[in-house]
Amino acid sequence: MKILAFTGAGISKQSNIPTFMERPDVREKLFRSYANVHHEEYNEVIKQLKANMNGAKPNDGHIALAEYNIPVITMNIDGLHKLAGSEALELHGGLPEDDEMDIAYSLYNKPVLYGDPAPNYQKAYEMVYTLQPEDVFLVVGCSFHTGISVDLREIAKSRGARIIEIQEDAAHNVRKTLEELIGDMK
C-alpha cells in the first residue's frame, strides 16, 4: 500500500495561517492581471501574506506526514511541509525571498497567480496516476473550489485508490489516520 497526500489551506489553518477563503480582500488581488497593473499594491499584498506566514510553525499534521515519509502534493505557499521535513510538490510555488519583494509583481511561481501557468500541475497528475487500487489518496484540508483539487480526486478515483478526506482538525487527525493505516512508528 502506498499513501499519497494532497493538502490545502486546511492543514495550515491550525498553524495560524488564514485561508484565502477567509481573506477575500487578499484573494481578489492574486491575479496576474492585477499584479501587472497595480505593482505597488500587489507587492504590499505579498508582503502582508509573507508577514502572516513568517513565524508560522508546522503543526502535527505536517510533522506526521514527514515522519511517515508520505509524499505530499500541496496547494499551499507557506512552506510548512518543507519545514517539517517533507519533500512536497508545491503546486502554487512559494513566496518571494526578502530581496525580491520590490519586484514581486513580476515574478512567476512566487506564488502562482490566477491566470499564470502552473508548472507543477503535470507532475501532480503523474503522481496521482501512479496510484493503484490498494493505495490511499489522503486529502487534507482541500476544498472543491479549484480545478486541480477536483481533478486529482477524480484521477485517484479512476485509478481505484481509496480516498480518505480529512477536513477538520487536521493537526490531530492526520497522525491518527496514518497510525490506523500504517501503525504506530514508535
Labelled PLM ranges:
Residues 1-186:
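Conserved catalytic alpha/beta core of Sir2/sirtuin-type deacylases, generalized to analogous enzyme cores
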